């Protein structure tokens, strides 16, 4: 819901009505979710269902990625669009669904876009769409490797 209120949310649906691709593209300047926003979005329920330790890890991970964005982008932090949650139904991966949908959205936005991925195979996928790795790091919460990638806007004529 947050992405649809504050940016570009895209669902690709097949002929049977099944969602086969989804992503959020948030424009710059969208306020980060604060503690109150997270509580309203169900944080207390998550703490009840998954426990306090898991909830603390969730908040620490969120804080880590926000700090990582500030470190990587420096003065540009908060002034760059963000790609979040690109997912394609496994049976439809490798068929051009995600790349076609994302390429169209990137043409519409025509501005710098940042993303993070924790899957090495995604790096080449995003590079084909004009993204470049600008940082690699290991998140201390969970010890997973993260690639931060940036795509500068294309100059339209």
What are these regions (language model features)?
Residues 1-11, 30-32, 78:
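A short helix-loop-beta-strand connector motif used in the catalytic cores of GNAT acetyltransferases and
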Residues 85-88, 94-107, 128:
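Conserved acetyl-CoA-binding loop-helix of GNAT-fold acetyltransferases
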Residues 99-100, 119-137, 142:
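Conserved active-site alpha-helix within GNAT-family acetyltransferase domains
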Residues 80-81, 107-119:
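Conserved GNAT acetyl-CoA-binding A-motif
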Residues 20, 144-149:
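Short hydrophobic/aromatic beta-strand or adjacent loop that forms the aromatic wall/cage
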Residues 6-25:
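Conserved beta-hairpin
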């Amino acid at each position: 819901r947050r992405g649809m209120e504050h940016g570009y949310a895209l669902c690709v649906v097949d002929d049977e009505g099944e969602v086969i691709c989804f992503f959020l593209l948030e424009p710059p300047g969208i306020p980060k979710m604060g503690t109150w926003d997270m509580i309203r979005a169900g944080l207390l329920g998550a703490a009840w269902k998954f426990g306090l330790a898991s909830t603390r890890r969730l908040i620490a991970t969120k804080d880590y990625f926000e700090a990582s964005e500030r470190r990587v982008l420096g003065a540009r932090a908060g002034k760059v669009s963000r790609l979040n949650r690109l997912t394609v139904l496994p049976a439809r991966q490798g068929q051009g669904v995600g790349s076609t949908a994302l390429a169209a959205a990137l043409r519409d936005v025509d501005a710098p876009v940042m993303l993070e991925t924790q899957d090495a195979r995604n790096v080449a996928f995003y590079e084909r769409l004009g993204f470049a790795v600008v940082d690699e790091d290991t998140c201390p919460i969970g010890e997973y490797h993260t690639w931060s990638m940036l795509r500068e806007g294309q100059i339209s004529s």
